[in-house]
Amino acid sequence: MVRSVWKGPFVEGSLLKKADAARASGRHDVIKIWSRRSTILPQFVGLTFGVYNGQKHVPVAVNEEMVGHKFGEFSPTRTFHGHSGDKKAKKA
């Protein structure tokens, strides 16, 4: 279900503080975050966030198309190794 409009987008408070500090300093360091559930806001465009996927921080460079999505969508938590091939086809 979609979040109701009157509530507004959810963003972790500490994330807003980190983003504002990064904008004020003018530095383009990776901002480490653990809040995968936070919504990407327009003020985050141009910043790079390190989104934690359970093992490491995956760098996510925010652009305009990402606004409105969640940070967790851009940091996969599971590794797909592929399906095994058909062994009978290799012998033929």
Curated annotation (Swiss-Prot):
GO terms for cellular component: cytoplasm; small ribosomal subunit. GO terms for biological process: ribosomal small subunit assembly; translation. The keyword Repressor does not apply. One of its GO terms (molecular function) is rRNA binding. The keyword Ubl conjugation does not apply. SUPFAM superfamilies: Ribosomal protein S19. Keywords: Ribonucleoprotein, Ribosomal protein, RNA-binding, rRNA-binding. It comes from the Bacteria. It holds the Pfam family Ribosomal_S19. Belongs to the universal ribosomal protein uS19 family. Protein S19 forms a complex with S13 that binds strongly to the 16S ribosomal RNA. This is Small ribosomal subunit protein uS19. The lineage of its organism: Bacteria, Pseudomonadati, Pseudomonadota, Alphaproteobacteria, Hyphomicrobiales.
